Structures are given as C-alpha cells and as structure tokens.
C-alpha cells in the first residue's frame, strides 16, 4: 500500500512539473519592434551547410551560380541589400579576382566592390531568391585555385540583413 502511495505521489509531482514548465514562446518576429527591420539572407541550395563547393574547369564559359534566399515578413519602401565578401585567409593557392575569376551580374557584366564588399539588392525587402554570379577567366597558371564567398551582416540606420550560421559560406574551386 505504501508503494502505491509513493507511485501516485510521484506521478502527481511529475505531472505538475510537466504542465507548469510549459511556456508559450512567440517565435514569429511580426509585431516585435526590434525585429521589424531585421532580415536574413542565406545560400539557398543543398546541402544547407557551409561546405558546398562549385568545382569548375578554368576554361568553363558558363557562369557559376549561387542562389541566395532573402527572408522578410514585410514589404518596405527601401531596398535592403545582402552583402558578401571574397575570403582568401587560410586558403593555400587562392583564386584571385580579376585573374582567375570575376564577380558578375546575370548578363556577365563585371561588378565592382566597395572596400571588398559586394551587394545583392532585394527591392522593397520582398522575400525572394536571387543569385550571385561568377565568371571564370581561363587563367593559364598551373594548379587548382580556391576562393571562399561569405555572406556578411549588413547593418544600416534603416535595417539589418543578418546571415544564417549554416548557410553563409560557399567555395569556388578552379581546376
């Protein structure tokens, strides 16, 4: 009988703890003032991680494409931009912009950076998928070259475009 009381009491305590620890969390940023002008951009491709590599031949004529998804809960009267940088730190034999490849638009026209930062604009902060384009320049130097492309946080007075921890980095390997 005493064992039955202990089991019953334990069950009541467990149930009370279970129900009292439940808390409704609001995960949708809509209506949270500090997040109303905060957006996210991430590479939109499989795998959803930071290891994806486009491995191409140096004489490839087709543009290299990396789709980027912009996440927003609102339409705005301004045009936020996701920013990206080309990283060579820690890369042996890095690819060189202007020598091994160029950053281009979808028509193949060269895009210039501002202090090493490139921008991908999302008009009216509308959720959509756009693309980063790269053109291989057929450099005849021997060896495989590699470059890292990182989406970086862009903070202005009007908005912030952040990145995801698992979808902000891609690589190009030119063979």
Annotate each PLM feature.
Residues 60-66, 128-132, 143-147, 167-168:
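Short, solvent-exposed loop/turn segments enriched in Ser/Thr/Gly
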Residues 156-163:
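Short, exposed beta-strand-loop hairpins at the edges of beta-sheets
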Residues 32-72:
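Beta-sheet-dominated interaction scaffolds and their linkers
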Residues 16-46, 164-171, 175:
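Bacterial Sec-dependent N-terminal signal peptides
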Residues 78-91, 101, 130-155:
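Contiguous beta-strand segments of beta-sheet-rich domains
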Residues 53-55, 117-123, 137:
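Beta-strand-rich interaction surfaces with strong enrichment in secreted/lumenal proteins
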Residues 109-114, 120-128:
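Short proline/glycine- and polar residue-rich coil/turn motifs
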Residues 1-22:
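Sec-dependent bacterial lipoprotein signal peptides
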